[in-house]
């Protein structure tokens, strides 16, 4: 770790710190890519990991004899050195392991200590599902926060952010650390309080939008570290309107999804603009779009959600717009407007990309299967979809700030991540984020059995086959989880199961308020659960009594995802 980052970590308690954005050319990226593997071999990081964990094991007898107050004092004395990966790290790991055992009743495995050391070093850890990532993140957060560093634990949804913050709170409290969580719907004051805690659990989307709000509050020119430090000296801390304390240390769960799959997704902060009074314009755009012919007037690439007018389509559109004024008078205006209308009609589908409720169109996050409250599509697309669905038109939004996950997470002074599926994107993660991936061996060998893929002729046959397979597993005493890719698909399968008189529960964007209850029961013997991506990454399903003996949880996937991960 560079001297600059060490210095920044020392200042972390007082200033809104973040790493300056890097501007790299192709040659810079090539040099880093070519030298990354060599650097990793020279550092012999894996040997150091094994030595740290072995030394932590050797400390167990001494540490277990310590009183609670002695544990606390020992960690605070060792934390700063542990953050720098100094000789204090093994003792610090042993201290937190003992505290977790005393306060949570969970004694971290060697594999979890190994992963915690990987994260503390600012690397990507590939840790298999079921190995205890939640506790691992908490161990790392304890070590970093004990040195005064503001820690963000980034999870994939609100449910996990709140659950893990509350579940790990006794461990943090043992060391005098405070914890907060950020979920959708919190007020600015609630967010400010949560970010002021030693450790903050939050989702990637909530975190980035709060950062953008701070950027808008600071102003277009931003604020230098010296300016923010001056505010601190004057008693203003971060300033009255700022939410975060800076971007010091992040632990990103399911990091490949956030850092790679969603890397270039633009996150746009906007404010309400003028009300929409001319609904007839949107209806006319939809009417004209419906008269255009696929293939001859426009071409669609559904997999990439792309659509463009052909030369013939532009001519047809000009003919259909003849005699109309306003936006229809110019070729550029009418072509952009009708292209958006075509996207609304053919690329965005109800119960797949959005949900209609209470006279509003709610966007469904394609990665998590959850509703994104208050989010809208831009450039008139949202209003066109509202018009298509017969909803009242919302106001135009004016863009205030935007950023991608890739640009945002590169601004952390120290970034780390965990996932069970990092191997195939390890080179890209190293190139873009300078994160070297380390595979953490499982505590016990996996007992998962992968069955062959079955292909059916049509949807109806597929749903019947799913019902039959679920019935077979249920008869054996196993709980069954059926994964679907969309809200619509989950409800189609639910209808088939109901016709077959098979009791089941459905977890999708309509039933998101019942998530905790559904997940808690999904591992019980004889339970059948149909779920969208909401029960995907980061979801822990605990097996009920007798389930392991019956074969464990039986998972049925009904569609392949875009990525094998």
Residue ranges of model-derived segments:
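Conserved P-loop NTPase motor core
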Residues: 1-565
């Amino acid at each position: 770790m560079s001297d600059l980052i060490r210095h920044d970590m020392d200042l972390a308690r007082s200033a809104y710190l973040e790493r300056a954005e890097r501007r790299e050319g192709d040659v810079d990226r090539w040099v880093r890519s070519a030298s990354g593997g060599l650097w990793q071999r020279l550092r012999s990081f894996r040997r150091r990991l094994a030595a740290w964990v072995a030394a932590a094991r050797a400390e167990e007898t001494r540490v277990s004899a310590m009183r609670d107050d002695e544990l606390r004092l020992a960690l605070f004395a060792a934390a700063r050195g542990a953050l720098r990966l100094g000789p204090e790290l093994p003792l610090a790991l042993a201290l937190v392991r003992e505290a977790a055992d005393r306060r949570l009743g969970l004694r971290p495995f060697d594999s979890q200590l190994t992963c915690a050391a990987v994260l503390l070093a600012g690397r990507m850890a590939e840790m298999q599902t079921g190995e205890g990532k939640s506790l691992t993140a908490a161990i790392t957060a304890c070590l970093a926060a004990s040195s005064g560093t503001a820690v963000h634990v980034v999870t994939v949804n609100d449910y996990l952010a709140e659950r893990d913050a509350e579940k790990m709170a006794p461990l943090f409290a043992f060391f005098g650390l405070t914890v907060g969580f950020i979920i959708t719907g919190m007020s600015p004051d609630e967010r400010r309080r949560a970010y002021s805690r030693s450790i903050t659990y939050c989702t990637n989307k909530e975190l980035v939008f709060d950062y953008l709000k701070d950027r808008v509050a600071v102003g277009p020119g931003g604020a230098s570290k010296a300016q923010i430090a001056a505010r601190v000296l004057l008693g203003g801390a971060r300033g009255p309107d700022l939410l975060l304390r800076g971007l010091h240390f992040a632990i990103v769960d399911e990091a490949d999804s956030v850092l790679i799959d969603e890397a270039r997704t633009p996150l746009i902060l906007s404010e309400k603009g003028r009300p929409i009074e001319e609904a007839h314009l949107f209806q006319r755009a939809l009417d004209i779009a419906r008269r255009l012919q696929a293939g001859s007037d426009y071409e669609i690439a559904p997999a990439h959600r792309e659509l463009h007018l052909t030369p013939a389509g532009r001519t047809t559109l000009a003919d259909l717009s003849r005699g109309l004024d306003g936006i229809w008078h110019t070729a550029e205006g009418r072509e952009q407007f009708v292209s958006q209308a075509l996207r609304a009609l053919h690329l965005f589908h109800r119960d797949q990309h959005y949900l209609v409720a209470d006279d509003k169109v709610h966007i469904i996050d394609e990665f998590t299967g959850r509703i994104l409250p208050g989010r809208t599509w831009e450039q008139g697309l949202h209003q066109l979809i509202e018009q298509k669905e017969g909803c009242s038109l919302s106001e135009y939004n004016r863009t205030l700030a935007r950023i991608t996950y890739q640009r945002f997470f590169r601004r952390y002074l120290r970034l780390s991540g965990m996932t069970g599926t990092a191997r195939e994107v390890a080179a890209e993660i190293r190139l873009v984020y300078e994160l070297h991936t380390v595979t953490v061996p499982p505590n016990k060998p996996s007992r998962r059995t992968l069955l062959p893929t079955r292909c059916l002729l049509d949807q109806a046959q597929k749903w019947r086959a799913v019902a039959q397979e679920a019935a077979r597993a249920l008869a054996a005493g196993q709980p069954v989880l059926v994964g679907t890719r969309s809200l619509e698909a989950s409800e189609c399968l639910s209808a088939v199961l109901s016709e077959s008189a098979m009791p089941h529960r459905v977890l999708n964007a309509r039933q998101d308020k019942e998530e905790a209850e559904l997940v808690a029961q999904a591992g019980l013997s004889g339970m059948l659960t149909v779920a969208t991506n909401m029960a995907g990454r980061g979801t822990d399903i605990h097996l009920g009594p007798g389930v392991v003996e019956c074969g464990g949880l039986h998972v049925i996937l009904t569609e392949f995802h875009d990525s094998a991960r």
